[in-house]
Swiss-Prot record:
MCR is a hexamer of two alpha, two beta, and two gamma chains, forming a dimer of heterotrimers. Pathway: One-carbon metabolism; methyl-coenzyme M reduction; methane from methyl-coenzyme M: step 1/1. Component of the methyl-coenzyme M reductase (MCR) I that catalyzes the reductive cleavage of methyl-coenzyme M (CoM-S-CH3 or 2-(methylthio)ethanesulfonate) using coenzyme B (CoB or 7-mercaptoheptanoylthreonine phosphate) as reductant which results in the production of methane and the mixed heterodisulfide of CoB and CoM (CoM-S-S-CoB). This is the final step in methanogenesis. Coenzyme M binds at residue 123. The gene is mrtG. This is Methyl-coenzyme M reductase II subunit gamma. Belongs to the methyl-coenzyme M reductase gamma subunit family. Its EC number is 2.8.4.1. GO terms for molecular function: coenzyme-B sulfoethylthiotransferase activity. It catalyses: coenzyme B + methyl-coenzyme M = methane + coenzyme M-coenzyme B heterodisulfide.
Length: 265
């Protein structure tokens, strides 16, 4: 019998958007063009055209003891070449940003190999070999996962995800890494992800707009689609909460099942 992944519960558009993000067979809509050179500038790990720094020789040149797991798992290109590990970190506004931290974590783990990801309330970091990171970052920035106004590339001083948007719909950024170009109607980055000034601004394109964000967001909100309106999602969350509360704190809830498992009838 074949198994089809369900990814996440829910019957609303929010749940469907989450499933699209996680489903590797779903192709993200490309919404903007960011050159490789501009992306490297915003990441701030190396200069455009600079070689990748390495932390060990290419795997083909190294001697290893026999390891069946290593033989079974194909290394990603950066690992093959010994390239160092680097990161990109996003902050997502709670005002209907396309993605949010837990959605990002699940999406990264379903879609990409060789990743390490960390989830906090208002930011999400993805770490991997720098060579592979740039390719993944390009997809994350050029597609529907990213909105220049409500998604921020922030390697440090990430605060702002829960603050009100400004008059141009931009999420607050204490380091002012990006500004709104009123002539073009575009968001442009004037600093890299840790706040170092760029020689030239990087154009990230036009903000998506409030109506479009409400359609594609993965965030439940009372003023859009409330989680209370998603019966299946609530049911699953309540089941998990009940099981963790009653079972996790003991209270003899699962004692009969435990005795059976231990063979003590």
């Amino acid at each position: 019998m074949s198994y089809k992944a369900q990814y996440t519960p829910g019957e609303t558009q929010i749940a469907e958007n989450r499933r699209k993000h996680m489903d590797p067979d779903y192709e993200f809509r490309k919404l903007r063009e960011v050159s490789d050179e501009d992306l490297v500038k915003v990441l701030g790990h190396r200069n455009p055209g600079e070689s990748y720094k390495s932390v060990h020789p290419p795997l083909d040149e190294m001697d290893f003891e026999e390891d069946i797991v290593r033989d079974m798992v194909e290394p990603i290109q950066g690992a093959k070449e010994g390239v160092r590990v680097r990161y990109i970190q996003f902050a997502d506004s709670m005002y209907n940003a396309p993605a949010q931290p837990y959605d990002r974590a699940r999406t990264y783990m379903w879609r990409y190999r060789g990743v390490d990801t960390g989830t906090l309330s208002g930011r999400q970091v993805i770490e991997m070999r720098e060579l592979d990171l740039e390719g993944v970052s390009k997809e994350l920035v050029e597609t529907e996962l990213f909105d220049p106004a409500t998604t921020g590339i922030r390697g440090a001083t990430v605060h702002g995800h829960s603050l009100r948007l400004d008059e141009n719909g931009l999420m607050f950024d204490a380091l002012q890494r990006y500004v709104f170009d009123e002539e073009k109607g575009h968001v442009v980055y004037v600093k890299d992800q840790v706040g170092r000034p760029l020689d030239e601004p990087v154009d990230m394109g036009q903000p998506l707009g409030e109506d479009e964000l409400k359609k594609i967001t993965t965030i439940y909100r009372k003023d859009n689609i409330a989680m209370r309106d998603d019966k299946e999602a609530i049911e699953v969350v309540e089941n998990i909460h009940t099981g963790r509360t009653l079972g996790g704190f003991g209270m003899d809830v699962f004692k009969d099942d435990l005795r059976k498992r231990l063979g003590d009838d």
